[in-house]
Amino acid sequence: MKQTLILLFTLIFIGCITGKEIVQVWSTLPDTDQLLINKTIDLKVSPEDVKELVEIFPDQTCQTVLGVGAALTHSSAYVFHQNLNSVRRDSLFRVLFTPEGIGINYTRLCVGASDFSFNLFSYSEKEDFTLRNFSIAEDYKDVIPMLKEIISINPDIQIMASPWSPPGWMKTSGSMIGGKLRPDCYDVYADYLIKYLQAYQQEGIEIHTMTVQNEPEYGTAAYPCMDMTADEQKLFIRDHLGPKLSASGLKTKIVLFDHNCDNPDYPVSIMSDSIAKSYVDGSGFHLYKGEISALCKVKEAHPDKNLYFTEQSGGGWAPDFDQNVRWYVGELLAGAMNCWSKNVLLWNLALDENDGPKNFGCQNCWGVVQVSSNGKVKHNAEYYAISHYGKVVQPNAVRLVSSGEALKGVAFRNPDGSFVYLAVYHGKETKVIRFKCANTMFDYSFKPGEVVSFKWK
């Protein structure tokens, strides 16, 4: 923290005494020893002829973006809570959740058990349509204490919640694994979800958005899951959850789908029902299948509704650190936000040295950070990808239209009036690229594979 403040004041001082306008630059090179290198360049162009141009159009505004982050799963909360003492945890949380660190401003909670919890559990274990014994006791162990610590550091963090499964007694399988929601349980399940939101509200925790079902097209997993067709989700939202949530007085917004980009017709068909659509804020997507352009297709069909990117995990199946940083920034962050997403969420915030604790699900998923049982913290590629966004893009920034084919990138204007461009250069040779934003221009020499975040006024 002290070093960050000294650097900031030094840069301000230098700018004052020289009178130069500067561009703040954060650079990551394929050489993993050069990660998030902070430097400045002059806000001017070189006399040489530069053929490649990226133009940012400050008057062509798109969506307001809320932030990036990852899920505080039960496993993530556990490793934060149990593997770090309070002093080291506070230090890590300030790195993760403040602008002086990597600027995480969005997280996701699991409503009950998921593939990253210790066991199968719900908040109402015995069949009871009155939900008299509803309790979030399991969440008091790790999730709620950790979430409260995070909120104390970043009170404005956005929170999404997603259920993996209703209680087993509400399902045709009689288990949290597999099956469908029983038709006679649509109403009580809506009550169950609202009770969850109310229980968190009583703890002083506002949940801003809630998806209806995590990965509704994957009902055959060995961990908590449920198959839910688009028609079933439409009926559940239109006739049960939507009316009940509206009547509850809660401000939580409903996000439908919450699955892969290979089936944009799922959310499009639900929102084709005007009543169901009236209860919905937008659609959520993962990118384990399909193309990120699916978000653009949904926006074209329903331009009045929002888009969210709700989950993506890295893991042992993609071990190339440098390639992962480039993919996350260029394909996922820039790709999703250029297709109107208001956020980007990765999967686990943290896991231990054994990629867990886990619950019959992914055996080699990685967190944004690894927090080992001995308290050692390791930063994964996801950490650096989030950093390239969070260090420069403020909450409630507005995406701007930009053009140029030399880079994978996305542009923003921050609430303080500064401009941002995130860029991934896939070229194999060093290349100078010129940036133009209204009457402002500057040049930057990209090295092969470089990931860069620019910020200027």
List PLM regions with ranges.
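Bacterial Sec-dependent N-terminal signal peptides
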Residues: 1-21
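Aromatic/acidic polysaccharide-binding cleft in carbohydrate-active enzymes
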Residues: 306-385, 402
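Active-site neighborhood of glycoside hydrolase catalytic domains
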Residues: 188-209, 216-317
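C-terminal beta-strand-rich structural cap/linker in extracellular carbohydrate-active enzymes
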Residues: 445-457
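Conserved, mostly hydrophobic/aromatic
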Residues: 70, 103, 159, 210, ...
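Carbohydrate-binding surface patches
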Residues: 391, 402-438, 449
